[in-house]
Amino acid sequence: MPRKPSPINLICLLLMAILMLPVVNVEAGHTDQPAIKCISAPVEDCVENMLRSMTLEEKLGQMFMIGIQGTDVDEESLFMLHQYHIGGIILFDRNMKTQEQVKQLNAHLQAQAGEKLPLFIAVDEEGGVVARMKEQLPPPPSAQEIGETGTPDNARLWARKTARALRNIGFNVNLAPVADIGTGRGRSFGNTPVVVTDFVRSAASGYEQEDFIYCLKHFPGLGRGKVDTHLDSTVVDASRRELMKWDVMPFQSIIREKTPADYFIMVNHATYSRLEKNVPASISKVIQTDFLRGKLEYQGVIITDDIAMGALSKYYAPSDVALRAVRAGADIILSCHVYQNGADAYHRLLRAVEKGEISEERINASLRRILRVKLTHLGKTT
């Protein structure tokens, strides 16, 4: 195991100098996390001040969301958090035993952020088969079950209930709702774009009412995919026009109506052969930059699906995936299970910037989007 690093104090000192306010707790009754404070400054001014205060290494760390292995913060997870300045954590059943234990774990994780930027702490709590700690935290109904009620407002009510339950044990991001059309295993609200759009829009409103970060997935839609991308690659043979008229409609509706700092969009690992041959969406500039940012004018955070899924890991090294994903337009690399994958990806991005393969301004563009979300939801500006 690599040697344990010394504590990282630079970002704490810089933020104290810039913001000149003590860290405060979030709303009473919620798990403590560092709060970002600005002195009567607009969010954009705070973003630029923070960006100027950060080293390249700290910026790159904010672009990673990783999984940890234990039920508490241990030496390995501490090393990852501090050595690589990690900006986000995702938890799975392996990390979660009881509600109180999860609350303490998340508090311990946030404590590692000190006076710097708070962590995104995420979970997949879609409902139905995709829900964590089911015996301790009763899961929401599946998206299919909610859709079958025929009442979109039920999606809003369940989103609010889910957000409250997750916040109470220290989470601040839910990687839901699924905006795919006709996905199997009960993960989709329906089989038509109109139905899915109505329910996704309602779910988004529920999360927003609770001031909770949510994530639309899996752009540009996995409903046509025939192979589970956890296992291997799948090819979608649809034109951009066909995607726009069907698969993309729920995403486009949210992009048009919602504030980009309120949510992420997750890109999937399917290959859309009529948009870009042999290139999965998660590493495709055509799909992320030209389509999602260009055509649809999305200005928020793009997060990849897990870079260790079979659709990528059978064909690419994790470090290559990270480099290609950032070049394509992604802001956050999701690495759920293996510490070394995250470390290798971080080092590859660092070398790429140092060698001029990626500009630091490209990294700054991602950081601006990430910081806007953290300033909006994980701290209070005054």
Describe the function of each predicted region.
Residues 2-11:
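Bacterial N-terminal signal peptides that target proteins for export
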Residues 12-22:
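Bacterial N-terminal signal peptides
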Residues 55, 96-113, 129-131, 191, ...:
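Second-shell residues forming the walls of enzyme active-site clefts
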